[in-house]
């Protein structure tokens, strides 16, 4: 297995969570959350992050309904992924992110109660779950 560095984004219209991980260990950690204006981040911040970490792959969470069908936000997440590829030339993978926010909120609450549930922390923790889910799928 390659030791690729992978960044994951939890796309949202107001905030975009970010996590980083190593494929060889299959683990991820929260990095940050970017403010977004109707789904559009500060692209300079994104560029700085990508230059700093130089990921081999970027995983973008794909928000689906519980039955697996797409919702309006699904197309916006795909567009965000396409823009990442177009602007920065990074390889993209999409990952089902159903229930990642619910799981992230529960994990953070277990560690720090309501004080731990600020929006940025939840979004970055969701990105961790998205990336670890992607690792699990790759491992089979």
Swiss-Prot record:
Keyword set includes Nuclease: yes
Signal peptide (residue range): none
InterPro entries on file: RNaseH-like_sf, YqgF, YqgF/RNaseH-like_dom, YqgF/RNaseH-like_dom_sf
Pfam family, one: RuvX
Top-level enzyme category: hydrolase
Record-level GO cellular component terms: cytosol
Cited function: Could be a nuclease involved in processing of the 5'-end of pre-16S rRNA.
NCBIfam families noted in UniProt: RNAse_H_YqgF
Family the entry assigns: Belongs to the YqgF nuclease family.
Protein name: Putative pre-16S rRNA nuclease
Name of the gene encoding the protein in the UniProt record: yqgF
